[in-house]
Swiss-Prot record:
Minor capsid protein present in the outer capsid, which is required for adsorption of the virus onto host insect cells (Potential). Could play a role in the host plant virus induced dwarfism. GO terms for cellular component: host cell cytoplasm; viral outer capsid. Residues 929-1116 form the PPPDE domain. This is Minor outer capsid protein P2. Keywords: Capsid protein, Host cytoplasm, Outer capsid protein, Virion. Belongs to the phytoreovirus minor outer capsid protein P2 family. The active site is at residues 953, 1111. InterPro entries: PPPDE_dom (IPR008580).
């Protein structure tokens, strides 16, 4: 989990705000530079006292669990028969608890993968998602939804309205059939019907049944697929015609998982079902959807032609979390009803003990199973494996139909005698070019072998493959012939220059410098002469080996402790090579992260390569077709030069004539039949080798053999060879964290070297002294480094300062609490919030922005993040016009206030009055933050901060810049701004899918945030505050943010605008403020909205007042 000194996205910012035990202190101390090796022991000891207590309690429970259960069973066995009903009730209660736990764990795994897949689709535009909701209370019915946005509803943009269809919302304990009908513009847009007699749901869109789903009841044995939402999408294009698409949950999963069914599909609408068109139109700058009850929709827009995939995936993600929250609420209600029945009868402690212990035992087992453990595995081979290199050769065919000509040293060669006159004994040769257009369809070597091995965790197969890069690359190879010593092939008659017409000779196919290396007794060629592809010198020969670690947690990686040795036999010579295994984290085609060991060794380090010949095996029906006679002109006779091939020089050279167009036809398994030779195009002179040396370091591939210097090469893995590797396992194949980290190897090495002898991560994290020792070892030899660097270096996968692994512990802890609701006072918010926190944690671990690399099919979209749009934006809101107030303000008072994306700002609360002490504290805090404070000043601020009595008022400012059409828009979200006033009046709320409206009184907390939106259409940076309704804040929230009581009569629009501008002025010009920390980050589409939504949804939990220590605690 990334710390605040390395914020990359809004989820990281949210983690700064989360009230997780012991995190705020560590974050604050890292920020203030107070964490060093010297004071680390005392600091962690004080910080983690509570965590040690929790760990000790868990340990004691596990030790005494079996004893407690035995006692409980003994006591229950003493019960009389009159207590049978009581035992039945207890069993019912226990069953409910375990059933909820089982269902929650099942849904957790299901939704986890769904959420992780969704996080792979990050927005590639700066166009936002606008939420809109309509309550089911008819008295509060809104006739229409009008979204007024400047420069949005034009012919340059498309708009989508996305509505969820939640099957879980229609499943309840009622017996009658349930239906939901939504009308748009007088038409039945869609209807959903649930038949309880067979638990089947029917979805109709515009009168057509688009899906039929069999449902499972909540609380019984569930099927996770039943709880995945489907989507109804209305797309309005340039011509104002609305298209209706239905996207079932199955198609969403296929789209996210890159199903083979959709290999060539790139747009989400391609996998959706297009139902029809509607009569809805977009006119006069607004969109209207009339008479829509029970609707929780999202409205998005982007330039025409730009895919809405990422925004729709983000919307779907939020609906997934809503569904889980609803399910959890229903489960808790069910549990409470059973518990009420249990508590209505008098029970002894023994009665209640047994189900509680069983539940605790199950949860502890689940926690243990979900905890990654450090494993040391030794992978060995049972027996000696001998394999011909050719049987594991894999060649990539890189030829295409457009590759028509290959260069070659093949040549026709003949001696001509004149019976009358001279010259005599003239040596003439004609080089040949080869047509390779049919090589694209040739079948070539594509083999590998699995060598059986064993490890401590079971069988480990080693996949072996030989690769020779570029062996069938038209840019890197030529055509040559391999044939036995002394072989001659007659293939055309030739008339020599100036010779009488009756004198001619037979042109013979000449051999290349590689020919004499291939003696017939050593090389079993099917024909005496075979064509082949000749690769350049120094071509590598890679022996590649792969071992899959299926039980590993990919996010935590691993480290190879010891490599093994393999051998290459070449005749009587044996060459030994050491493997070079590395731990690689990769994403499979299904989108799942996996871990494997990969080794690639170039054997030419000991067996150098001067030449490669890939023989195209001649078939029995291969034929060399004779050509017509040809007359040749005299060109460059008797010229000599030299030619170098590899380490050898060939000196006896004679002139010859070049002729093009020698056709080569490919047959199955790369079989070649030479075609008719064309001697009509004589181009230029070249040289031809007539005499040869031998002994070239040549590789020749013939059938299943690879020959080196004429001898077949054999691969051997000696018996007993072993590879030792350390990695982290996840027994449930459902690891606590599932991260995509481009620096996984380095991170895993840090973790393993910290304490490679530990049995598990849990053991390391539960022992403070071990953790301190591990940290200090990591710090050596530069002990002056701060712990923040160590935490950052391991990518936040396991925080050495946080002993409980991952937010799944929080989830399990909540389930444990549910088992005893009378003591814990738990409600469904706790479990829902825990799961949301876990999803956000998993998302930020999986995608650490800034470490991603191109080429990952699941993450390619991240390459197009609109960072340039933000970084190139020159219109900073320096001056803000406030039209209702009739004034303009210059924004900011800090040097690094203007250009940052996230600021944490402190203001003097003046609790100590105006005077030197107040000024001195402000200056001291500023010096600490700027690393300019002395030892005394640092410790003073640290002590005040730890006790949360630092006399300053904190708030956070998050800035997001967009360009919408021709308008530059800056959204500034302030959190921690309320001064303790309350939100007056009543608040109405409806549960997802529920028709009942709940009236909640006494909601006495501030909104927790204020959203200032300013826009500009000019290049000079003059920004103007927008209408307050664009911010999405209500009248109540604006009055609460201003610290004013809401009037008894609703204020006018102009009055609210005046108050809105006053808040903007106060926040942008506040004197005495300074930025404690700022972060340059890229806020992607929807992230600012998501963060704001988190604040809103947690208002009832935290009661945002933000005064005194609350604000400091929040901003920590």
């Amino acid at each position: 989990m990334a710390y605040p000194n390395d914020v990359r996205n809004v989820w990281d910012v949210y983690n700064v705000f989360r009230d997780v035990p012991n995190r705020e202190h560590l974050i604050r101390d890292i920020r203030n530079g107070l964490v060093t090796v010297r004071n680390l022991t005392n600091m962690l000891t004080n910080m983690e006292r509570d965590d040690q207590l929790i760990i000790a309690q868990l340990s004691n429970m596990m030790k005494s669990l079996s004893i407690g259960i035995e006692k409980a069973q003994n006591e229950l066995s003493k019960l009389k028969t009159t207590d049978a009903d009581r035992a039945a009730v207890l069993a019912d209660y226990q069953t409910s608890v375990l059933n909820i736990e089982r269902n929650t764990m099942l849904l957790t795994g299901y939704f986890k993968q769904l959420v992780l897949d969704l996080t792979g689709y990050v927005g590639a535009s700066v166009y936002p998602i606008l939420p809109f909701m309509i309550t089911g209370d008819q008295s509060m019915m809104v006739d229409s939804i009008n979204v007024n946005m400047k420069n949005v509803f034009d012919d340059k943009h498309e708009q989508e309205i996305v509505l969820p269809i939640h099957p879980a919302c229609f499943v309840s304990t009622i017996t009658e059939d349930t239906s939901s009908v939504v009308y748009a513009d007088g038409d039945e847009l869609y209807s959903v019907h649930v038949r309880h007699e067979n638990m089947t749901m029917y979805v109709n869109v515009l009168g057509e049944t688009v899906e039929t789903r069999q449902l499972s009841m909540i609380g019984e044995s569930i099927v996770p697929d039943d709880f995945a939402p489907s989507l109804l999408i209305l797309r309005f294009s340039q011509d104002s015609v609305g298209e209706v698409f239905y996207l079932s949950h199955d198609n969403i999963k296929k789209f996210l998982g890159h199903s083979l069914e959709y290999t060539d599909k790139y747009v989400i609408f391609d996998v959706a079902r297009r139902a029809s068109t509607t009569r809805n139109t977009i006119t006069d700058g607004f969109c209207s959807v009339d008479g829509v009850p029970y609707l929780d929709g999202r409205f998005i827009y982007q330039p025409s032609g730009i895919s809405a995939d990422s925004n729709i995936c983000a919307i779907y993600n939020s609906y997934v979390l809503d569904v889980l929250r609803y399910i959890t609420e229903c489960e808790v209600d069910t549990l409470r009803s059973v518990y009420d029945r249990t508590s209505s009868t008098v029970f002894s402690k023994t009665d209640v003990l047994r189900p509680r212990l069983l539940t605790m035992q199950s949860n502890i087992s689940a926690l243990s199973a979900a905890t990654p453990q450090l494993a040391n595995d030794v992978i060995t081979s049972d027996s000696t494996d001998l394999l011909s290199l050719g049987t594991v050769l894999t060649v990539s065919n890189e030829f295409t139909a457009d590759d028509t000509t290959l260069s070659t040293s093949l040549a026709g060669h003949c001696q001509v005698d004149y019976s009358e006159g001279s010259p005599q004994d003239k040596s003439m040769s004609i080089p040949v070019s080869c047509d390779s257009s049919q090589l694209a369809s040739s079948t070539v070597h594509s083999y590998s072998a699995d060598i059986l091995g064993h490890g401590l965790k079971g069988d480990r197969n080693l996949n072996l493959m030989i690769n020779v890069p570029g062996l069938m690359n038209p840019q890197k190879v030529t055509v040559d012939y391999v044939y036995s010593d002394g072989y001659k092939l007659n293939f055309a008659s030739v008339v020599a220059p100036d010779a009488p017409f009756w004198i001619n000779a037979t042109l013979q196919l000449s051999l290349s410098p590689s020919a004499h290396n291939m003696l017939s007794k050593l090389t079993p060629l099917d024909n005496d002469a075979c064509p082949g592809l000749k690769a350049q010198a120094n071509t590598p020969v890679l022996v590649s080996m792969t071992i899959n670690l299926d039980d590993a947690t990919p996010a935590l990686g691993g480290e190879v402790i010891q490599n093994c040795v393999f051998k290459i036999h070449h005749g009587d010579d044996v060459y030994s090579f050491v493997t070079d295994f590395d731990v690689i984290s990769y994403t499979s085609t299904s989108g799942t992260n996996c871990l494997k060991l990969i080794s690639s060794v170039d054997i030419t380090s000991q067996l150098p390569s001067d030449m490669w010949i890939y023989v195209m095996n001649g078939s029995p029906d291969a034929a060399f077709i004779s050509g017509d006679s040809v007359n040749m002109s005299s060109v460059d006779w008797h010229q000599s030069t030299s030619q170098t091939v590899g380490n050898y020089v060939y000196a006896t050279m004679k002139a010859y004539w070049n002729v093009t167009s020698y056709d080569v036809e490919a047959r199955p398994y790369a079989t070649y039949v030479p075609g008719k030779i064309n001697f009509t195009a004589i181009d230029h002179a070249d040289v031809f080798v007539d005499d040869y040396n031998t002994g070239v370091n040549s590789y020749v591939i013939v059938n299943s053999r690879i020959y080196y210097k004429g001898n077949s090469s054999i691969y051997e893995v000696p018996s007993g060879s072993f590879i030792k590797v350390s990695y982290f396992t996840s027994p449930l194949k459902n690891p606590t964290v599932d991260a995509y980290n481009a620096e996984i190897s380095r991170n895993s090495a840090y973790l393993i070297k910290a304490n490679a002898s530990l049995d598990s991560v849990a053991a390391m994290l539960s022992n403070i002294s071990n953790r301190i020792d591990a940290m200090e070892r990591l710090m050596e030899p530069t002990r002056a480094h701060r712990i923040a660097g160590v935490v950052s270096s391991i990518g936040g996968v396991i925080s050495l300062g946080m002993p409980l692994l991952g937010a799944i512990v929080v989830t399990i802890g909540s389930i444990i609490s549910i088992a005893d609701p009378d003591k814990q006072g738990i409600d469904y918010h706790s479990v829902a919030n825990a799961f949301m926190s876990w999803c956000q944690y998993a998302a930020v671990c999986r995608y650490e922005y800034g470490l991603l690399k191109r080429g990952d099919e699941k993450l390619d979209v991240l390459s197009f993040m609109p960072k340039r749009v933000v970084s190139d934006f020159k219109n900073k809101p320096d001056v803000i016009s406030l039209p209702e107030l009739g004034e303009s303000v210059l924004r900011g008072s800090s040097t690094d206030y203007l250009d940052t994306e996230i600021n944490i700002i402190y203001n003097d609360m003046q609790l100590l009055g105006q005077g030197k002490l107040s000024d001195w504290l402000n200056k001291t805090v500023s010096k600490v933050e700027n690393n300019a404070a002395n030892f005394f000043e640092r410790n003073l601020v640290k002590s005040l901060a730890n006790k949360e009595v630092l006399p300053v008022h904190a708030r956070v400012e998050i800035t997001q810049t967009e360009k919408i059409g021709d308008v530059y828009r800056t959204t500034i979200l302030y959190t921690g701004i309320n001064e303790g006033s309350y939100l007056g009046g009543d608040v109405f709320a409806s549960r997802l899918g529920d028709k009942n409206i709940l009236r909640m009184n006494g909601f006495e907390s501030g909104p927790g945030r204020f959203k200032a939106i300013v826009e500009s259409t000019t290049e000079v940076g003059n920004f103007r505050v927008v209408d307050w309704t664009v911010s999405g804040m209500s009248r109540y929230e604006i009055y609460a943010a201003a610290g004013e009581v809401y009037p008894s009569k609703d204020p006018s629009h102009a009055d609210v605008q005046l108050l809105y501008e006053s808040i903007v002025r106060d926040l942008t010009t506040r004197d005495g403020s300074f930025v404690l920390k700022h972060h340059d980050v890229l806020l992607l589409p929807g992230q600012l909205d998501a963060f704001e939504e988190l604040i809103i949804k947690n208002a009832s939990n935290y009661q945002y007042a933000f005064i005194g220590s609350n604000c400091s605690k929040l901003c920590a």
